[in-house]
């Protein structure tokens, strides 16, 4: 059955960025699904360096972002549009018409989500989705309880996610939007390849449940076991109790460390 491959090393963001660069070089007009938050910033820094110093060409690359807060104007410094411009798009030669975002100020969120889903289907599927993981195992804004067949939709953020994101809003939880637009788990799973980055001790429990646990709605990232080409890039803290290996979700949630599992040695 499909399984999650784990690559544990000191600089997982760099290794992940180089994998994305391989995809861009082999398919110049590739479609990338992109994540935001503090975790992927080093990935974008390395991609920008590869563009600046080694000529990595983004001129034909198309991108879709995972999610966007509901109710924040595009000029707000906490929108994910602003984030991507600050950390990647302004530093590479990507064309504005090739980047795609959900509109958090749309008058009809359901229609906006349907538009985005159809746009992704027309241009995609994504060659790579870059993901982070929340402390509660969420991917994008697919919080615990999100169904496996979920599509792009409006979601209500859990209190734990609001608490975690308050640091981006001056530690004022009242300023964190309570809703967001997010691609669904089924949308993510249609990508040809999924790369998830997790760093720090605070992500250890979520990584462990995702890699070694069963596929369950209470840990949305666990559904990634069903994808044929999914790799977790983790540092030593986040991956302390998992190995550089290929892990399969079963009723017993076993983890195999044999070379026949195509272990990803860092």
Curated annotation (Swiss-Prot):
Annotated compartments: Cytoplasm
EC annotation from Swiss-Prot or TrEMBL: 3.5.99.6
Coiled-coil boundaries: none
Disulfide linkage: none
The reaction(s) this protein catalyses: alpha-D-glucosamine 6-phosphate + H2O = beta-D-fructose 6-phosphate + NH4(+)
Pfam families: Glucosamine_iso
Keyword terms of this UniProt record: Carbohydrate metabolism, Cytoplasm, Hydrolase
MF terms in GO: glucosamine-6-phosphate deaminase activity; identical protein binding
GO biological process, one term: carbohydrate metabolic process
PROSITE patterns reported for this sequence: GLC_GALNAC_ISOMERASE (PS01161)
InterPro entries reported in the protein's UniProt record: Glc/Gal-6P_isomerase (IPR006148), Glucosamine6P_isomerase (IPR004547), Glucosamine6P_isomerase_CS (IPR018321), NagB/RpiA_transferase-like (IPR037171)
CC annotations in GO: cytoplasm
UniProt-annotated catalytic positions: 67 (proton acceptor), 136 (for ring-opening step), 138 (proton acceptor), 143 (for ring-opening step)
Family: Belongs to the glucosamine/galactosamine-6-phosphate isomerase family.
The protein's assembly and partners: Homohexamer.
Function per UniProt: Catalyzes the reversible conversion of alpha-D-glucosamine 6-phosphate (GlcN-6P) into beta-D-fructose 6-phosphate (Fru-6P) and ammonium ion, a regulatory reaction step in de novo uridine diphosphate-N-acetyl-alpha-D-glucosamine (UDP-GlcNAc) biosynthesis via hexosamine pathway.
Protein name (database record): Glucosamine-6-phosphate deaminase 1
Organism placement in taxonomy: Eukaryota, Metamonada, Diplomonadida, Hexamitidae, Giardiinae
